[in-house]
Design a protein with these regions (language model features):
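Extracellular secreted precursors and ectodomains with disulfide-bonded cysteine-rich loops/domains
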Residues: 22, 80, 102-105
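Short cysteine/histidine-rich metal-coordination sites, predominantly Zn2+-binding motifs
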Residues: 96-106, 118-131
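N-terminal pre-ligand scaffold of iron-sulfur
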Residues: 25-97, 112-113, 129-144
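Sec-dependent bacterial lipoprotein signal peptides
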Residues: 1-24
Length: 144
């Protein structure tokens, strides 16, 4: 009888750890508020000066959006909110010495846009939030 109670206690403790401890991890998606928006940009007007590997800052999202042009027809759009401390409400800014590297002015985390917005250095563990993009003819749509 005593062995059965001990086994039951171990099983319940294991289930408790399996359910509660992973929930202590903060989900990146919960850090940055979800906003619904649609932004339309003309490829040959609004983005004419955006070469491959280049970036352009636009209004939108939580703290602004940075557009990264990966190839002729492939674009990525990232929210400029640092995923380490989004409550600081400070937008990441482009590192003047490296193309496609953005740095948080609060925590010093750097993000590589050519690597999916992944953190490169600093305390941030999650990539910048990426918004959906689609190119239809000469119109780039950024949406969430």
């Amino acid at each position: 009888m005593r062995k059965t109670k001990m086994t039951l206690l171990c099983v319940l403790l294991g289930l408790f750890q399996g359910m509660v401890l992973p929930s202590c991890e903060t989900n990146r998606g919960e850090l940055i508020p979800y906003l619904e928006f649609d932004i339309y940009l003309l490829l040959y007007a609004d983005l004419a000066d955006l070469g491959i590997g280049g970036t352009k800052l636009i209004d939108g999202g939580v703290n602004g959006i940075v557009i990264y042009r990966e190839s002729d027809l492939e674009f990525h759009a990232y929210d400029r909110t640092c995923t380490m401390w989004p409550e600081h409400d400070a937008a990441v800014t482009e590192d003047p010495t490296f193309f496609g590297v953005f740095e948080c002015p609060v925590c010093g985390s750097t993000y590589l846009l050519m690597n999916g917005g992944e953190p490169n250095s600093g305390p941030a563990r999650y990539p910048l939030v990426e918004y959906s993009t689609s190119l239809n003819g000469d119109v780039l749509r950024i949406f969430n």
